[in-house]
Amino acid sequence: MAELTIRPEEIRDALQRFVQSYEPDAAAREEIGTVTYSGDGIARVSGLPSAMANELLEFEDGTQGIAQNLEIGEIGVVVLGDFTNIAEGQTVRRTGQVLSVPVGDAYLGRVVDPLGRPIDGKGEIETTERRELELQAATVMQRKPVHEPLQTGIKAIDALTPIGRGQRQLIIGDRQTGKTAVCIDTIINQKANWESGDPNKQVRCIYVAVGQKGSTIAGVRAALEEAGAMEYTTIVASPASDPAGFKYIAPYTGSAIGQHWMYQGKHVLIVFDDLTKQAEAYRAVSLLLRRPPGREAYPGDVFYLHSRLLERCAKLSDEMGAGSLTGLPIIETKANDVSAYIPTNVISITDGQVFLESDLFNQGQRPAINVGISVSRVGGAAQTKAMKKVVGSLRVGLAQYRDLEAFAAFGSDLDAASKAQLERGARLMELLKQGQYSPFPMEEEVVSIWAGTTGHLDDVPVEDIRRFESEFLAYLRREHSKILDVIRETEDFGDDTAEALTDAIKEFKKTFQTSDGTILGTEAPAEALDESEVGQETIKVAKTSGK
């Protein structure tokens, strides 16, 4: 009888074939956990040893939750929805998935909750595509520098702190200073681009409301509908009555919807209103999950909370489709303190900030933008040639005006040049004012700023500046529309355009009546006196002998 010999090579090959052909049956083993604690929007679950971080869990009543704290023996879960029906002893099931939301063009014109479910009463949203909330942002090699302007329609921003497609521009200020109004104006200003039908010009907009009053969100929606802007806008609403978990994920839901369009080569604008309330919701959740508190009781990863969100805003390279996601995060300060924890975090993440001051707001300067400390780190790269040419002296003129204004407050006598700078500065500040929900087209912004910086408004009384501006622009649209067309189409401002505007403004001044009844441009020019009309006085100087 021959001996049975087993060679090691055969055993190794057999094991290798078995490993390569093995396919685990996920359905064969389903983990079931048990709720050990529930309350205040969180739950603790035991018995799910294989659960992953940020995995979606499902409770008995169908409510979903996100696995956050993976501890020995139990998991800390953020409940997404009503937690009142979750009780100790109930079962919890793993889904094997991370949180995702439906995406697609069907979301345009709709109002949804942080899970992507419609809440506007217009029926279900028909879409087949989904996108995960926690996806990696575009890498360095997938991006390109910001170079295309995104017009806000607000003169102070487009001229002094320009925003480009793919930029993150922080809107920061105290409560009730017009932060939301600035962002809504920017959304409304995209209407002309949307109606053009040009995919390279069209901008889809997303407004994420975190912790706002329900009436405030309804007011924003009404304003957008009245302006015809809801056609290209999606609202993700997580009002103050929502659980902390919803407020925490709402900005990620909005960015997931926007990223879907960005990676299709489209342009997107997203407004986060506001990230202060998201940070507070995340702090509440973290403290309930017993995470160690840090500065101002925020958890240690609150910087990562915002950085991973805002890094998703990008201008993609041509190879990736050249789409863009522009972010306008809003941060609320207390007593204009920008050195607090969350404001400094977001300032360091973003590409610039627009600072709104309550003092300026109360003085009637609206939008209440402090142009001195507002900055755009993208700068002129996100401006048209026309705007670059006319704003050169605007920032310097405003800076000199602020310095002289502080000096003149002491009652000191000023020379003629300083008085002229003060007069022009007051007119420039008046020129930067504009009404809410009334954004300016780019060509009209250029004309207004050109008129102010070149001295054509120096003879217009300060109280008549805004009326002069609106009537002059209406006159141009009516009588000299070609000038505006040239600026809009070429995005440049040449000498011929400047000459044509100079002639037009001189003609218009002859018809403009100031509030005191004076017609501008009707004063006869001063003529030189004849030599015989000039009296000559002889001054005798007495000589004194020196000692």
From Swiss-Prot:
Cysteine disulfide partners in this protein: none
Pfam families found in the cross-reference section: ATP-synt_ab, ATP-synt_ab_C, ATP-synt_ab_N
Q: Source organism's superkingdom?
A: Bacteria
Q: Where is this site: Required for activity?
A: 374
Name the GO cellular-component terms: plasma membrane; proton-transporting ATP synthase complex
PANTHER family documented for this protein: ATP SYNTHASE SUBUNIT ALPHA, MITOCHONDRIAL
Q: What does this protein do?
A: Produces ATP from ADP in the presence of a proton gradient across the membrane. The alpha chain is a regulatory subunit.
Full protein name: ATP synthase subunit alpha
Q: Which organism is it from?
A: Thermobifida fusca (strain YX)
Q: Upper lineage ranks?
A: Bacteria, Bacillati, Actinomycetota, Actinomycetes, Streptosporangiales
